[in-house]
A protein has these predicted regions:
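Extracellular/periplasmic carbohydrate-active domains that bind, remodel
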Residues: 2-492
């Protein structure tokens, strides 16, 4: 859990209007053109008595059509080409639901799910939520099931704590993430499921999380907050074409899952809302695709995890085979994409590409420390654009929160095989920070075609206990990243 914080209230309606109204998020082509023009203007302002080729790499990976690094298809969601048809389709109204925003529909949703579970092995089922405001506590999904929100449908999270029952802590965490013991269930929940779709016509799920945030701020929270959506020990999951607002805690949290697709999502929370990660797509999960999402939150936009200290190491369920692409967003206190800090089961084979992060604390961050154990390996980050990001690239220690006193300070993480290429950061505040661990240096870190603009001339990269190589970097990287000739760049 991050300690990211920033006080800024009343953001949601502004954000919703901006996303859903006439103002459109910029196309990738326009963003590409903007970065190219600004980069060229910056070049023209450089003192002409120096050779431009010595000062800054000319090939950003933005101008040409080819991309260094792994060549993968334009979509990683091929196994969900079409939402499956269901034999039984019912409306929440069929179970007594009233969409007036005031009447509790908790019993209606739970009755609906009990009914839908009958068709798990006989053609599946779909629950339609029509236009309206549907107040409800938590409810459990079933297998071979689709939750479909029509245009104008809004599911509202109950403000009654009793309608978010307590469930056991995850075994890879050993306790609730925020408090000892049990934790609150998520608003939309499932365990041991197969073939689950949560989709619609850009309907909305609003967790109404302010009640939960105030418990955290006031230090009166007794049990760990629930997520907006959590699926456990499940497979073949599609979350698609919806808006998620105001999660009490992490917004989307698949754990111990496989074959997960999260696409075309808008996820919003106030920038000061604590620990409202947008998507934690892989917590000890494998085969994950996240693409084409817009996120603004009070924590990481996307965070990859795999368990906490000795509990994660004991369970030893890694997160692997993960693709995150075409994610845009803002998090003034955290990172666009974070790996860790809970990564004790291991993280490997991650591709992150085509990210646009603005007005944020960090672009990409690897977070770990003594006690975590585990490993982070074979991470590829390619084609990333940033504006007004404080620290564009950050590998940092300082994950000094532990589940209990039994954590092992000798359990150090192993980090190696990190490839970062084709990165442009404008109006940066600080240079990259790369901090390994003395007894376990971060190895085989390679950076190519990385340009960080906006830094004062006296600002230098900060590196400690790392080793690797670099090619075409501006400004010059730290000496631990051995400089290679442009003609020997291994990614080319």
């Amino acid at each position: 859990m991050s300690t990211c914080r920033e006080s800024m209230e009343g953001q949601n309606q502004i954000l919703i209007n901006r996303i859903k109204g006439n103002l459109r998020r910029p196309s990738w082509a326009s963003v590409l053109l903007l970065f190219t023009v600004i980069a060229l203007i910056s070049l023209l302002q450089i003192n002409r008595e120096y050779s431009i080729s010595l000062l800054i790499p000319l090939d950003f990976g933005l101008i040409s059509g080819s991309r260094p690094g792994p060549q993968i298809s334009s979509s990683c969601s091929d196994f969900f080409k079409q939402v499956p048809a269901r034999k039984v389709v019912k409306s929440i109204r069929d179970f007594g639901g009233i969409g007036d925003g005031k009447t509790s529909n908790t019993k209606a949703f739970r009755r609906a799910m009990e009914f839908m579970a009958r068709f798990t092995d006989s053609g599946g089922s779909q629950l339609v939520v029509p236009k309206g405001r549907w107040l409800t506590g938590s409810f459990n999904l079933s297998s071979n099931f689709t939750l479909f929100l029509e245009q104008g449908a809004v599911i509202l999270g109950s403000q009654d704590l009793k309608e978010w029952p307590l469930i056991n802590a995850l075994p890879s965490y050993g306790r609730g993430r925020e408090r000892l013991g049990a934790r609150h269930i998520s608003l939309i929940h499932g365990n041991g499921l197969t073939n689950v779709v949560i989709t619609g016509e850009n309907g909305t799920v609003d967790g109404q999380g302010k009640m939960w945030w105030e418990l955290w701020w006031n230090r009166t929270l007794v049990h760990t907050r629930g997520h907006l959506v959590e699926l456990i020990n499940s497979q073949n999951i599609l979350i698609h074409n919806l808006t998620f607002l105001n999660s009490p805690f992490w917004t989307i949290h698949p754990v111990y899952c496989r074959n997960i697709v999260i696409r075309n999502m808008t996820i919003l929370a106030p920038w000061n809302a604590p620990n409202t990660d947008g998507i934690d797509p892989a917590d000890s999960s494998v085969n994950v695709c996240v693409e084409d999402c817009y996120i603004e939150s009070g924590d990481d936009l996307v965070a990859v995890k795999s368990g906490w200290d000795q509990y994660g190491m004991k369970m030893a369920r890694p997160s692997s085979n993960i693709i995150v692409r075409r994610v845009t967003g803002t998090t003034p206190t955290c990172s666009g994409v974070g790996i860790g800090s809970e990564m004790s089961g291991g993280v490997s084979n991650v591709i992150i590409e085509d990210l646009y992060v603005r007005d944020s604390a960090a672009g990409v961050r690897i977070k770990t420390d003594r006690g975590r154990g585990g490993y982070i390996t074979n991470i590829t980050i390619n084609n990333m654009k940033m504006e007004r990001v404080k620290v564009p690239i950050r590998f940092s220690r300082g994950a000094n929160d532990h589940p209990d006193e039994r954590w092992d300070p000798k359990a150090v993480p192993r980090v190696r095989g990190i490839r970062i290429s084709n990165v442009v950061s404008l109006e940066s505040k600080r240079p990259p920070l790369l901090e390994g661990i003395e007894e376990a240096p971060f190895l085989d870190i390679h950076m190519e075609n990385v340009s960080i603009f906006g830094l004062a001339p006296n600002m230098k990269w900060n590196c400690e206990y790392i080793s690797g190589s670099s090619c075409s970097i501006f400004p010059a990287p730290c000496s631990q990243l051995k400089n290679e000739s442009t003609f020997q760049c291994p990614i080319h």
